[in-house]
């Protein structure tokens, strides 16, 4: 069992707290005028991915390291219940349930490289790449001269997600989208 001391805390470090894995998303070392120095840490619960807590650790405290593994795999297919990912080196399949995939299911297209976070050999989180290229299935037609406008219109992409795109984007075009913000980035040539 490995432990991290507070002076080893870094953003992205994964630790165990109350029997559950957490990731450090913010770490601030505070040395008050009086009293003992401490670390004010913001943590994201990895099982749900949504719960964020703030905790204070005294300087020199030790916390158990989480046995978390991040694996780079490619998305293969979905059978309605599980999303399947493949390791292209040894062709091993890993199945992730809807809880692990979460809202990111809308960005998964065949052969999309993803990062699967495993805890106790079970997927607890799936993270798609920051940018994906998807085809526009439907949108209002563009009008000549719309290239210099900052007005956006809704467009439905191949995965069913709806994003706002500039007026010059037409049906059938491939666009680059930021998966973290669901925002249009550029048109793919």
UniProtKB/Swiss-Prot annotation:
It is found in: Cytoplasm. May be beta-lysylated on the epsilon-amino group of Lys-34 by the combined action of EpmA and EpmB, and then hydroxylated on the C5 position of the same residue by EpmC (if this protein is present). Lysylation is critical for the stimulatory effect of EF-P on peptide-bond formation. The lysylation moiety may extend toward the peptidyltransferase center and stabilize the terminal 3-CCA end of the tRNA. Hydroxylation of the C5 position on Lys-34 may allow additional potential stabilizing hydrogen-bond interactions with the P-tRNA. One of its GO terms (molecular function) is translation elongation factor activity. One of its GO terms (cellular component) is cytoplasm. SUPFAM superfamilies: Nucleic acid-binding proteins, Translation proteins SH3-like domain. The modification N6-(3,6-diaminohexanoyl)-5-hydroxylysine is found at residue 34. Keywords: Cytoplasm, Elongation factor, Hydroxylation, Protein biosynthesis. Pfam families: EFP, EFP_N, Elong-fact-P_C. It comes from the Bacteria. GO terms for biological process: peptide biosynthetic process. Its main location: cytoplasm. InterPro entries: Elong-fact-P_C, NA-bd_OB-fold, Rib_uL2_dom2, Transl_elong_fac_P/YeiP, Transl_elong_KOW-like, Transl_elong_P/YeiP_cen, Transl_elong_P/YeiP_CS, Transl_elongation_fac_P. PROSITE patterns: EFP. Pathway: Protein biosynthesis; polypeptide chain elongation. Belongs to the elongation factor P family. Involved in peptide bond synthesis. Alleviates ribosome stalling that occurs when 3 or more consecutive Pro residues or the sequence PPG is present in a protein, possibly by augmenting the peptidyl transferase activity of the ribosome. Modification of Lys-34 is required for alleviation. NCBIfam families: efp, PRK00529.1. This is Elongation factor P. It comes from Baumannia cicadellinicola subsp. Homalodisca coagulata. The gene is efp.
